[in-house]
């Protein structure tokens, strides 16, 4: 059996492949299952270069709502992560199906294809992850700072960020 993420043989250990992971594997879309979170939501890791094709496939599958997109710095000097929470919303669903997608990118050249063209709600969320962490969402139509001034230097939410000209504010007691 081949791992669809690395094209290497997998071991038959306690690796959990959920329903969506099996569906993506059936359609030969590269990914790596990361198990489920505390709510039972399946989590998958996708390579940056596979992000666009997997996003289109998930939209076709029925994930019509981008609940959130966020990003974080994994470790000082390490990689950056972009996280997507997608929901399959239907009129008669009491418990809509959800999935979490994680994309890890190198800190030196953090590029991910934009999903704005699939889910318009990604607009401000991708701009925020660019503004705070410097992740470039390729083909985003308005990728510019959204929270910080355009003249701001650096990426404030990176763990190795040093605040320029920072002065500690003293309490006035």
Swiss-Prot record:
<keyword id="KW-0874">Quinone</keyword>
<keyword id="KW-0472">Membrane</keyword>
<dbReference type="GO" id="GO:0019684">
    <property type="term" value="P:photosynthesis, light reaction"/>
</dbReference>
<dbReference type="GO" id="GO:0009535">
    <property type="term" value="C:chloroplast thylakoid membrane"/>
</dbReference>
<dbReference type="Pfam" id="PF00329">
    <property type="entry name" value="Complex1_30kDa"/>
</dbReference>
<dbReference type="GO" id="GO:0008137">
    <property type="term" value="F:NADH dehydrogenase (ubiquinone) activity"/>
</dbReference>
<dbReference type="InterPro" id="IPR020396">
    <property type="entry name" value="NADH_UbQ_OxRdtase_CS"/>
</dbReference>
<comment type="similarity">
    <text>Belongs to the complex I 30 kDa subunit family.</text>
</comment>
<keyword id="KW-1278">Translocase</keyword>
<keyword id="KW-0150">Chloroplast</keyword>
<keyword id="KW-0793">Thylakoid</keyword>
<keyword id="KW-0618">Plastoquinone</keyword>
<dbReference type="InterPro" id="IPR037232">
    <property type="entry name" value="NADH_quin_OxRdtase_su_C/D-like"/>
</dbReference>
<keyword id="KW-0520">NAD</keyword>
<comment type="function">
    <text>NDH shuttles electrons from NAD(P)H:plastoquinone, via FMN and iron-sulfur (Fe-S) centers, to quinones in the photosynthetic chain and possibly in a chloroplast respiratory chain. The immediate electron acceptor for the enzyme in this species is believed to be plastoquinone. Couples the redox reaction to proton translocation, and thus conserves the redox energy in a proton gradient.</text>
</comment>
<comment type="subunit">
    <text>NDH is composed of at least 16 different subunits, 5 of which are encoded in the nucleus.</text>
</comment>
<keyword id="KW-0521">NADP</keyword>
<protein>
    <recommendedName>
        <fullName>NAD(P)H-quinone oxidoreductase subunit J, chloroplastic</fullName>
        <ecNumber>7.1.1.-</ecNumber>
    </recommendedName>
</protein>
<keyword id="KW-0934">Plastid</keyword>
<dbReference type="GO" id="GO:0048038">
    <property type="term" value="F:quinone binding"/>
</dbReference>
<keyword id="KW-0813">Transport</keyword>
<dbReference type="InterPro" id="IPR001268">
    <property type="entry name" value="NADH_UbQ_OxRdtase_30kDa_su"/>
</dbReference>
<dbReference type="InterPro" id="IPR010218">
    <property type="entry name" value="NADH_DH_suC"/>
</dbReference>
């Amino acid at each position: 059996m081949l791992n669809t993420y690395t094209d290497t043989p997998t071991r038959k250990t306690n690796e959990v492949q959920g329903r969506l992971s099996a569906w993506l594997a059936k359609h030969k879309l590269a990914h790596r299952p990361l198990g489920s979170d505390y709510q039972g939501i399946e989590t998958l890791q996708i390579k940056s270069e596979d992000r666009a094709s997997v996003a289109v496939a998930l939209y076709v599958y029925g994930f019509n709502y981008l609940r959130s997109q966020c990003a974080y710095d994994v470790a000082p000097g390490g990689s950056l992560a972009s996280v997507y929470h997608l929901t399959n919303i239907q009129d008669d669903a009491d418990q809509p199906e959800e999935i979490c997608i994680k994309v890890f990118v190198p800190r030196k050249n953090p590029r991910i294809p934009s999903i704005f063209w699939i889910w318009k709600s990604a607009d401000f969320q991708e701009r925020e992850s660019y503004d705070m962490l410097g992740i470039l969402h390729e083909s985003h139509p308005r990728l510019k700072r959204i929270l910080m001034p355009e003249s701001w230097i650096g990426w404030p939410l990176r763990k190795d960020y040093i605040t320029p000209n920072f002065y500690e504010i003293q309490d006035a007691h």
